[in-house]
């Protein structure tokens, strides 16, 4: 019930020391609930590396979920959508008027912009134009550098990790089990964006929904973290050489993209694992991107004191940071 974290000791070249971390017993139970509604939602352009945002909204504007909040000054086709409907209440700026955050007072009943469905006959150019226009392109990342994918180029292959090996992270077999249609729709269009394959890793003994998905190259992986990292899959299957690039999409973002393709609506939802030693009732919650963290943890933390630290990331990433 322990995990080993490794780091390089600068005084002993390439020798590893082990920090044992006890995490057993703190995992989320396989119970899914809707997250309590957050009053406010925020979108922070700094979450997207290399983007110089230009606002498409102003304070007091009423918006729909899926309306474009901002775009990249250096590429106006690269757009970023609102996860919720509501009213723009605040635009927080930093030095030199840099946009730090766009704050939205959410409607009690969410209203979605309908951008129309993407036809199954769509070609590569149609797909790129659609994903850019509806604000879904930023879900596609490029390696090296982990930046938003360059839609003007073509990756040699695309990668998805369907297995999260990081302790206390969400079990993707559980979170994705009811989204076969959305995942299939997303994977089918991603296939048209590369001359290579859409490569997906799953845990060897799992009952993953990806076993039912067509148009993918499936890899069974096993072993401790980071076996489930998409970088581990890339390194084993199709390493990135000089001058090459591959694209990656997170498994839960496939659901958002697929829903947009099938319904024309931007439903920016993710199922998150609420877990840890201070959580009274560890469980899974369906939350909307940009929600306030206290809306998720509200009334579910015991022994609240200065020793608690709430992280919107995995256990390993918390130690690395």
Can you describe what each PLM-predicted range is?
Residues 77-85:
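Short coil-to-beta-strand transition motifs
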Residues 1-56, 71, 105, 218-221:
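N-terminal, Lys/Arg-enriched amphipathic/low-complexity engagement segments
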Residues 51, 57, 74-77, 281:
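Short, solvent-exposed loop/turn positions at domain surfaces
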Residues 78, 92-321:
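Buried, small/hydrophobic-residue-enriched core segments of structured protein domains
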Residues 51, 82, 98:
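Exposed loop/turn and edge beta-strand positions of beta-sandwich/beta-sheet ligand-binding modules
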Residues 57-71, 90:
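Short, well-structured beta-strand-loop connectors
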